[in-house]
């Protein structure tokens, strides 16, 4: 509505601008000034309305954001209501204890057990050294002649020969 009035006033200003009669021109100029004043007021009103519209949109956006943040806070609080930091610490300690116990059990199960045979560590080391020394001694005693390696089969027919290339002689 204000936009239509604005257009109407602009047309009136243009119409009154071109009059040649001095008293009529003076009257037209007065009307033009009034119309320009009304036009400025309408422009200011439209600007204020646009500003208010943007402010209202921003307020609605802020309201929605706050509602969502409140809902998120309530949901988080509900999720944490059943949790207590002491209970969480206790639970984490129980998990760590059970993990440690499981590792101890695995280590105990994987240890070799002699089932009544107790061997002295020094005796085992001495026996291992003897076995390690026997292997090189055996290799030294078993020196044999050269090994025979079977040769590949050779064709029994004559292969075609290539013609000899002639060499260029330079003089």
From Swiss-Prot:
Source domain of life: Eukaryota
Sequence similarity: Belongs to the SNF7 family.
Biased composition (Basic and acidic residues): 1-17
GO biological process terms held by the UniProt record: autophagosome maturation; late endosome to lysosome transport; late endosome to vacuole transport via multivesicular body sorting pathway; midbody abscission; mitotic metaphase chromosome alignment; nuclear membrane reassembly; plasma membrane repair; regulation of mitotic spindle assembly
InterPro entries reported in the protein's UniProt record: Snf7_fam
Region (Disordered), start-end ranges: 1-24, 132-171
Gene Ontology cellular component terms for the protein in this record: amphisome membrane; cytoplasmic side of plasma membrane; ESCRT III complex; kinetochore; kinetochore microtubule; lysosomal membrane; midbody; multivesicular body
Protein name in the entry: Putative charged multivesicular body protein 4B-like protein CHMP4BP1
Alphabetical list of Pfam families matching this protein: Snf7
């Amino acid at each position: 509505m204000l936009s239509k009035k604005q257009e109407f006033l602009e047309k009136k200003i243009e119409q009154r601008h071109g009059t040649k009669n001095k008293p009529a021109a003076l009257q037209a100029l007065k009307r033009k000034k009034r119309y320009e004043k009304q036009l400025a007021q309408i422009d200011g009103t439209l600007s204020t309305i646009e500003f208010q519209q943007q402010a209202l949109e921003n307020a609605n956006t802020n309201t929605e954001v706050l509602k969502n943040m409140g809902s998120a806070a309530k949901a988080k609080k509900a999720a944490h209501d059943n949790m207590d930091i002491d209970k969480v610490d206790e639970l984490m300690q129980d998990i760590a204890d059970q993990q440690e116990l499981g590792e101890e059990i695995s280590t105990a199960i994987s240890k070799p057990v002699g089932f009544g045979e107790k061997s002295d560590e020094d005796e085992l080391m001495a026996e291992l050294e003897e076995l390690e020394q026997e292997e090189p001694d055996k290799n030294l005693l078993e020196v044999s002649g050269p090994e025979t390696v079977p040769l590949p089969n050779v064709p029994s027919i004559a292969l075609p020969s290539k013609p000899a290339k002639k060499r260029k002689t330079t003089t």
